[in-house]
Amino acid sequence: MKDKFSAQREKMVQKQLAKRDIEDPKVLDAFRKVPREEFITESKQHQAYGDHPLPIGHGQTISQPYIVAMMTQALEPSSHDIVLEVGTGSGYQTAILAELTKKVFSLERIPELSEQAGRILSKLGYQNIVLKISDDDNDLTIHEQKEFDKIIVTAAASQIPPELTQQLKEGGTLVIPVGELMFQELLVVTKHNGELRKKSLGGCRFVPLK
């Protein structure tokens, strides 16, 4: 049975993602499955599939679908990956990752957002997600998992945090926006023989990480 947003969801996938440069069929399928409207307040649900960010409270936003898709595709997720997400936010990106990978650890510094995301993700039936609240803005570690195949950061850092690259497995990928408030660059960082290789996906605009 189709829900009332299913046509809007498919239109988003076709027009905002597939007609641009989102080509991975698994990524596109994940966006077909995850109901973005669930992660948005009821008064804004009619805008759920617009190509723009929306406020979620506490000075934070849910990113526009294309940005979430671009970052997800750049991560090159696979079904055996253990992933770290820094910045749970609404939980929408978390759900997309959970559709594509083995397990997602997601770290959030705002308790109310983490709790809200937890309720939504539980309602949707996800069982491969572990949500964590960071007690310290400078602590970006998950103590029960030392290394990750993939790391994604959904807020902008002034520079690439070394504690994240230290947690990245050899051959792993980190996707992170880096820069100051007025200019940021979305970077894809890979680790090869202990060395970091960086590729830019272009300019972007995210709320600050700290």
Swiss-Prot record:
It comes from the Bacteria. The keyword S-adenosyl-L-methionine applies. Its main location: cytoplasm. It catalyses: [protein]-L-isoaspartate + S-adenosyl-L-methionine = [protein]-L-isoaspartate alpha-methyl ester + S-adenosyl-L-homocysteine. Transmembrane segments: none annotated. Catalyzes the methyl esterification of L-isoaspartyl residues in peptides and proteins that result from spontaneous decomposition of normal L-aspartyl and L-asparaginyl residues. It plays a role in the repair and/or degradation of damaged proteins. HAMAP family: PIMT (MF_00090). Belongs to the methyltransferase superfamily. L-isoaspartyl/D-aspartyl protein methyltransferase family. This is Protein-L-isoaspartate O-methyltransferase. It comes from Natranaerobius thermophilus (strain ATCC BAA-1301 / DSM 18059 / JW/NM-WN-LF).
